[in-house]
Amino acid sequence: MKNLLHKIASAFVVCAALVAFTACNDDDGKVKKPQVSSELVGSYTPHYFKEVPDEWGGEPSRLYLEVAAAWTDPDNIPGIDLSESMGMPAGSFVMPFNTILDLVSAIGSQFVSSGLVQLDLHSDGLFAAKYHDVVVEEGADIMTTIFSPTFAEAVSVFPSAETAAVLPEGALSFYTESNLFFAAVSKDFIRAIEKQEGMEILSEIDKMLGAYKGLSVVSTDSHYAIPFKYTFEGGVLRLYVDRAMMLLYVKLLKDVLGGLGLDPSQMMGLDPAVILDDLFNATTELQIAVYLKKM
């Protein structure tokens, strides 16, 4: 069972982490480029949705990634017990979820505003991007990289010769349907990864979709796609997922985490499954949204 979950985790990460988009293919393997009829076709730059005043009178902070929640009991918001990580007795230092979500919004906003330069959604369903790579200093720990990221001055481009070896053009695409934005990945691209890595990915994804009924993943002969909700008003695209959409994946995520055999002693006393349950039980609404301004 653990090996199966490892395979499922690998397959799921490939699809979810690519966060993206697919093209349809001819029987001879050549990429078709059907036209996408969508109001979203165009070029975008990061857009902030909120300014937070600086308590010392400096420039306000701008937030580009929204993480918002409505709480079951606003006066008693639970949190995560970080006492063990601080070398303190259990229950001494509990960070409430609302503070944690604000922190996630602030950290994510750095990556959106400083990392992404431009996103292009093309009429053939493909996309392009200009961005700054995250610079990982030698010897830097992961927490430093996350909380205080450094970005390269040079602007990188996708697709390019440098990115083609990892993500060939046509592997990722998008389409809109029924007021949803679908991010999809080509099955031919996944087959290429299977051949290169000697892994069974497609079959494990299909097993996962069969085992976890109700997941919102769309599977066709050519691609897998994951839907996102969106609004488009005044030239601003708000791309988001809500609590109901996330809830579909909670059981899968908990099972995958359980199958990884994580050592509790290395998790600072934290149980990801319990944290997920506590968060969703404490909320009536939860949204994660990114804002983009059409150029």
Language model feature labels by segment:
Residues 1-12:
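Bacterial N-terminal signal peptides that target proteins for export
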Residues 2-3, 17-47, 282-284, 288-295:
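Bacterial Sec-dependent N-terminal signal peptides
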Residues 25-27, 53-61, 83-89:
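General N-terminal leader/first-domain-start detector
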Residues 36-76, 130, 292:
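Tryptophan-anchored aromatic micro-motifs
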Residues 62-102, 256-276:
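A solvent-exposed, charged loop/short amphipathic helix patch at secondary-structure junctions
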Residues 83-252, 256:
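Contiguous, well-ordered beta-strand patches that form the walls/edges
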Residues 275-283:
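Short, exposed beta-strand-loop hairpins at the edges of beta-sheets
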